[in-house]
């Protein structure tokens, strides 16, 4: 039977290289805090316990986690071994397997965590499992010296011999151990080093000295990249986006210029979706089969139906719902608006706090005037209604089914089904007036030039 699982996530560092008032592990990747990327992978294992070790800006972490994990405070911060020990009280009475993870290493797949736990549960019963990798440039990393998959020694780069530096297998910092072994070993770690800190890696050396097996599991370097600076954050974003683009195309979406499309962590695409260059998706976007998103569109919090066309240069904001084959064209902004099947707003329009019936046509320059300075109000446009260009619909207002609003109208009262509403000033015709005006102005200008 599988042992229960606990995850200890270290997130107590100050993150000074980020130069930010926001906690390092809360900086977003694809619109989601990096810590929550990691926690989502942890959740795939159905852990019995999750403990996040916090220090600086603990209140921010508490808010972000929203009660989904227990918090343990590390104060003062005396190294990684000391940090893990702060989780001991939260795991009191827990007799299972423990994963030790880092909040600034967000891309560890659940499958890699499972591989570590499987190795921990093997018949040779290792005391500690170390996750290691082979980076392109191992210069900065501690080395993992092995005999087969047995860890013989772990050594920091600065302390390594030339022969040890030639080894390319490096320590990711991630480990797994049984709870009873982990805390017993940590109790024996000392701060007998120049930094006067308690190092987590020392549990491997202690276990080896006891004659216990310490095993290694290898992973791809991309899975264990740490984020300590804005440059590394940007690199992590690029890594995530590249993976997601490949995933989207493999699932049946067409990306005309993949490197220019930016997804959110939760973007959902149907089959045969086409995305043109320079499109940005914020959180909460669902796109059904066969929709087309044209260039330079920005979409967040929107549900887009099958066969819809959006853009170019469109902005869909939270609360937008487009029915099947609806069209939103260039320089159209939509917020908290529901458009029925086949409804169209092809250019230069704002639709906010509105419902638009199936087959309705919204002319260029139409504005739903939804805000009175204090409250938002609803505009309701019926099925097959036609709103002429340059119209202002002052909410709250209802436009009936099959109604027509003439171009240039400012509508403040409801329009019934099938009605024509024209709201314009009187059109005056003054024959010859323009000729007389130009003649007078030319004479005046000539007189001024003679002075």
UniProtKB/Swiss-Prot annotation:
Cofactor(s) for this UniProt protein: Mg(2+)
Region (Linker), start-end ranges: 231-251
Compartments where found: Cytoplasm
Residues where UDP-N-acetyl-alpha-D-glucosamine binds: 10-13, 24, 74, 79-80, 102-104, 142, 156, 171, 228, 317, 335, 350, 361
Pathway annotation from the record: Nucleotide-sugar biosynthesis; UDP-N-acetyl-alpha-D-glucosamine biosynthesis; N-acetyl-alpha-D-glucosamine 1-phosphate from alpha-D-glucosamine 6-phosphate (route II): step 2/2; Nucleotide-sugar biosynthesis; UDP-N-acetyl-alpha-D-glucosamine biosynthesis; UDP-N-acetyl-alpha-D-glucosamine from N-acetyl-alpha-D-glucosamine 1-phosphate: step 1/1; Bacterial outer membrane biogenesis; LPS lipid A biosynthesis
Active-site positions on this chain: 347 (proton acceptor)
A Pfam family the protein falls into: Hexapep
Region (N-acetyltransferase): 252-451
UniProt entry keywords in alphabetical sequence: Acyltransferase, Cell shape, Cell wall biogenesis/degradation, Cytoplasm, Magnesium, Metal-binding, Multifunctional enzyme, Nucleotidyltransferase, Peptidoglycan synthesis, Repeat, Transferase
CDD domains: GT2_GlmU_N_bac, LbH_GlmU_C
Top class in the EC scheme: transferase
Presence of keyword Protease: no
Enzyme Commission (EC) number: 2.7.7.23, 2.3.1.157
Reaction(s) the record says it catalyses: alpha-D-glucosamine 1-phosphate + acetyl-CoA = N-acetyl-alpha-D-glucosamine 1-phosphate + CoA + H(+); N-acetyl-alpha-D-glucosamine 1-phosphate + UTP + H(+) = UDP-N-acetyl-alpha-D-glucosamine + diphosphate
GO function term, MF aspect, one: glucosamine-1-phosphate N-acetyltransferase activity
Free-text comment on the cofactor: Binds 1 Mg(2+) ion per subunit.
Binding positions (acetyl-CoA): 364, 370-371, 389, 407, 424
A GO cellular component entry from the record: membrane
Primary location recorded for the protein, binned into one broad class: cytoplasm
PANTHER family, per the entry: BIFUNCTIONAL PROTEIN GLMU, NUCLEOTIDYL TRANSFERASE
Family, as annotated: In the N-terminal section; belongs to the N-acetylglucosamine-1-phosphate uridyltransferase family.
Function: Catalyzes the last two sequential reactions in the de novo biosynthetic pathway for UDP-N-acetylglucosamine (UDP-GlcNAc). The C-terminal domain catalyzes the transfer of acetyl group from acetyl coenzyme A to glucosamine-1-phosphate (GlcN-1-P) to produce N-acetylglucosamine-1-phosphate (GlcNAc-1-P), which is converted into UDP-GlcNAc by the transfer of uridine 5-monophosphate (from uridine 5-triphosphate), a reaction catalyzed by the N-terminal domain.
Quaternary context: Homotrimer.
Protein name (Swiss-Prot/TrEMBL): Bifunctional protein GlmU
Species: Sphingopyxis alaskensis (strain DSM 13593 / LMG 18877 / RB2256) (Sphingomonas alaskensis)
């Amino acid at each position: 039977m599988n042992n229960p699982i606990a995850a200890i996530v270290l997130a107590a560092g100050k993150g000074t290289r980020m130069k930010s008032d926001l906690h390092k592990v809360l900086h977003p990747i694809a619109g989601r805090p990096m810590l929550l990327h990691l926690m989502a992978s942890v959740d795939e294992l159905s852990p019995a316990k999750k403990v996040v070790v916090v220090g600086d800006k603990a209140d921010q972490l508490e808010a972000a986690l929203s009660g989904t994990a227990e918090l343990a405070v590390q104060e003062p911060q005396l190294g990684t071994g000391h940090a893990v020990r702060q989780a001991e009280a939260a795991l009191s009475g827990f007799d299972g397997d423990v994963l030790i993870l880092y909040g600034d290493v967000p891309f560890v797949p659940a499958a890699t965590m499972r591989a570590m736990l499987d190795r921990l549960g093997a018949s040779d019963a290792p005391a500690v499992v170390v996750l290691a990798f082979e980076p392109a440039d191992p210069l900065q990393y501690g080395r993992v010296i092995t005999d087969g998959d047995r860890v013989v020694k772990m050594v920091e780069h600065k302390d390594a011999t030339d022969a040890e530096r030639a080894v390319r297998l490096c320590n990711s910092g991630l480990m797994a151990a049984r709870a009873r072994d982990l805390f017993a070993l940590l109790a024996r770690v000392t701060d007998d080093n120049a930094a006067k800190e308690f190092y987590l890696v020392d549990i491997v050396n202690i276990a080896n000295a006891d004659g216990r097996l310490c095993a290694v599991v290898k992973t791809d370097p991309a899975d264990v990249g740490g984020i300590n600076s804005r440059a590394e954050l940007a690199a992590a974003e690029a890594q995530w986006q590249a993976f997601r683009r490949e995933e989207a195309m493999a699932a049946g979406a067409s990306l005309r210029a993949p490197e220019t499309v930016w997804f959110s962590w939760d973007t959902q695409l149907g089959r045969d979706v086409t995305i043109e260059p320079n499109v940005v998706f914020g959180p909460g976007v669902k796109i059904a089969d066969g929709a087309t998103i044209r260039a330079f569109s920005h979409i967040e919090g929107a549900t887009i139906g099958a066969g819809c066309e959006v853009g170019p240069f469109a902005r869909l904001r939270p609360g937008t719902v487009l029915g099947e084959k609806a069209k939103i064209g260039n320089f159209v902004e939509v917020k908290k608006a529901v458009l029925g099947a086949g409804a169209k707003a092809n250019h230069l329009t704002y639709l906010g706090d509105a419902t638009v019936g199936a087959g309705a046509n919204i002319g260029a320059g139409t504005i739903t005037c939804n805000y009175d300075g204090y409250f938002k109000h609803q505009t309701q446009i019926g099925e097959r209604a036609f709103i002429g260009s340059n119209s202002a619909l002052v909410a709250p207002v209802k436009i009936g089914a099959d109604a027509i609003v003439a171009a240039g109208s400012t509508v403040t009262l409801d329009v019934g089904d099938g009605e024509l509403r024209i709201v314009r000033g009187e059109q005056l015709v003054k024959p010859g007036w323009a000729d007389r005006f130009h003649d007078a102005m030319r004479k005046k200008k000539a007189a001024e030039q003679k002075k």
